[in-house]
Amino acid sequence: MKKILIATKNQDKITEILDLLSDINMKLISFQDIDFNENIEETGRSFQENAVIKALTAGRKTKITTLAEDSGLEIDALGGRPGIYSARYKDGSDMDRCMKILCEMKNISKEKRTARFITIVAIYEPLTEKVVTFEGMSEGYITDKPLGKNGFGYDSIFYNFALKKTNGQAKLAEKNKVSHRSEAILKAKQFLIGL
């Protein structure tokens, strides 16, 4: 059975990806399964560059077909911040980062709070040395307070237009029907099936 390495140490992302790929006829493994402890530096200037860096680095070292992704939140009123720095926007917890965003946006009206989550999935195939990428996007806006306890990252402050509630108020199955990550992963899934 073909192996696919999911190149992330973020357990929440692994959970979402495993759920989305649960019916694929391949063995999905993570860094923990192969004792991969290297820290991959995200030195790219875009989600695509970072996803490709992660896929190439992990795939070349392990010689396993590798799926990596980079995601982030872009807020129009903040000039696209936090963007590629979403996970590193502020030291501390996910809630600390949410509160920083809410503080920065406290005087911004609802109609100017538009935002989107973007995911780029990169798949590296060691036999061909090629990388292919897939994009997913969710449109919405930033709420004025956290709503919901599900998900991770900025989910509690991102009102998802497709869900008609925050990602934090949605169950994983609901979120995985319309999220930026699910859109990109489902495109990648079709590619993987063809390998």
Predicted feature locations:
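Anionic-ligand binding patches
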Residues: 2-5, 11-195
